[in-house]
């Protein structure tokens, strides 16, 4: 029940949006699908070609999260999903604790991220949704399970919004789906324990 209270506690509080685009420099999936802006309040571009670049990128993400004026909704695309998962597992708990949740769009196949973003196989320390536009959900199932994320296969056209309204739409989507996940997990827990 604590999780539900925590979720409803920030329902009317805007989240700071921190975006991590993919390394391929194309429009991020959230922009193509929903018309959300390419960047949130803070954007941490993924320009990583070596472990040195990766560590600099992680320090920039740490700073963006620390400087956010509210809890953070992390929105990542492509290789940015694997990079964000790597960051979440290995960065300071104070920084990661500021993340309310993550929307992870079109993560790459596991083999693509294994070199620079290999990380412990542990659930992410915040709720996360993987949105797989088109393509097969099977392509990302391993990542989804390893991250403890919920998968949303999205292959139908969506209404497109713009500007600040678009980020409010992203927050509502995240909250609605997260509340459904929590309610489902609570119901499942009650069924297992026989509590009604």
What are these regions (language model features)?
Residues 69, 73-76, 102:
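Conserved alpha/beta-hydrolase fold motif
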Residues 106-165:
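The feature captures the conserved acid-bearing segment of alpha/beta-hydrolase catalytic domains
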Residues 8-11, 112-137, 175-196:
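Conserved serine/cysteine hydrolase catalytic core
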Residues 94-109:
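A conserved short beta-strand
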Residues 19, 74, 104, 129-132:
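Structural beta-sheet core signal
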Residues 74-89:
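Gly/Ala-rich beta-loop-alpha elbow adjacent to hydrolase catalytic centers
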Residues 148-196:
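C-terminal catalytic histidine-bearing segment of alpha/beta-hydrolase fold enzymes
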Residues 2-71, 154-159, 184-195:
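Active-site catalytic motif of lipid deacylating hydrolases and related acyltransferases
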């Amino acid at each position: 029940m604590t999780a539900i209270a925590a979720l409803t506690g920030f329902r009317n509080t805007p989240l700071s949006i921190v975006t991590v685009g993919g390394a391929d420099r194309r429009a991020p999936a959230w922009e193509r699908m929903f018309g959300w802006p390419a960047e949130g309040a803070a954007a941490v571009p993924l320009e990583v070609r070596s472990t040195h670049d990766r560590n600099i990128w992680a320090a920039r993400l740490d700073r963006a999260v620390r400087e956010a004026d509210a809890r953070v909704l992390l929105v990542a695309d492509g290789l940015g999903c694997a990079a964000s998962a790597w960051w979440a597992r290995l960065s300071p708990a104070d920084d990661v604790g500021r993340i309310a949740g993550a929307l992870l769009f079109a993560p790459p196949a596991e083999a693509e991220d294994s070199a620079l973003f290999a990380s412990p196989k542990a659930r992410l320390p915040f709720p996360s949704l993987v949105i797989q536009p088109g393509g097969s959900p099977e392509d990302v199932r391993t990542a989804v399970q390893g991250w403890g994320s919920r998968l949303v296969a999205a292959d139908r056209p969506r209404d497109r919004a713009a500007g600040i309204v678009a980020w409010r739409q992203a927050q509502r989507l995240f909250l609605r789906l997260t509340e459904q996940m929590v309610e489902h997990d609570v119901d499942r827990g009650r069924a297992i324990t026989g509590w009604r």
